[in-house]
Structure formats: C-alpha cells, structure tokens
C-alpha cells in the first residue's frame, strides 16, 4: 500500500490552549486530534496544513513552523502515512465543519490518544516520559516513528 502524505498542526491560542478536531471517520474515528489532512497533488505541505485547518476549523494560521515528521501505520484499516507536524498560532474564531466538532483544550489534558500526546510533546506543548508514551502507543493499533532526527 502506498504511504499517503499528510500535514497536521498544533494550533495554539493566546491562552496556551491547543485546537482539537473530533475525527469523523477513518482509523481515528471519534478521537480528538490536531487539525490537518492529506496533501493534494501540486500542493506544498504548508499550503495543505493551512487549507485543512481552514476547512476543519475556520481558523487561519500564523507563525507556522515545521516540528517533526512521522511514519504512521494503523493496522486495523491498513492506514499508512508520512505525517508532517507543524506548530502555529490560530487566527480567527474556531468553528466546526458540518458533522464534526472542534474545541480548545489544555495540551496536558487527560484522556488523549497516545498519538496526540506524542505530537504535543514534540511540539513542546506537553511533557511526556518517552518510555511511558511508547508503552501507551503499544496499546493502540497505531505505530509512529519519527523520521526527521
């Protein structure tokens, strides 16, 4: 199976909260994750993350910076992606697209998917014990390997 290319962003507001989107479908259905999605043909990574954030949340992005790149594999739905993580500042009022939900949350909140915890830690927004996080990821059907170090 071909590895898809995606871009996601840790959008932070003036209060240090991070913008999350409830996933409607796919391997992460029901989970609260960072906004983002697939990169379209001919589109840059930055343009893709800006477009996806605007579509999913209504927000624009400022101060966008690349943080990390991961190979992500999910075994149940055979999802494979190369995901580029950005960090930026959200501009505008957050609103969900039809059938979805968005919320501002503390980056160190409880109950987050292990993949989100890894991303927030790499973006410098959350402290995590690497061994504990690796064990948490092992309990999911998702593997994440950072490939930019």
Describe these PLM feature segments:
Residues 17-55:
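Conserved Nudix-box catalytic region and its N-terminal flanking loop in Nudix hydrolases
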Residues 70-94:
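Active-site-adjacent beta-strand/loop module that shapes the phosphate/pyrophosphate-binding cleft
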Residues 1-18, 69, 87:
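Conserved N-terminal beta-strand and adjoining loop/helix that marks the start
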Residues 59-68:
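A short coil-to-beta-strand element that immediately follows conserved catalytic motifs
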Residues 18, 27, 73, 92-94, ...:
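Flexible, glycine-rich phosphate/dinucleotide-binding loops
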Residues 31, 95-149:
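Nudix hydrolase/Nudix homology domain
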Residues 13-16, 24, 89-93, 107-108:
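Short loop segments at secondary-structure junctions
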Residues 2-4, 34, 65, 79-83:
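Short connector loops at helix/strand junctions that flank enzyme active sites
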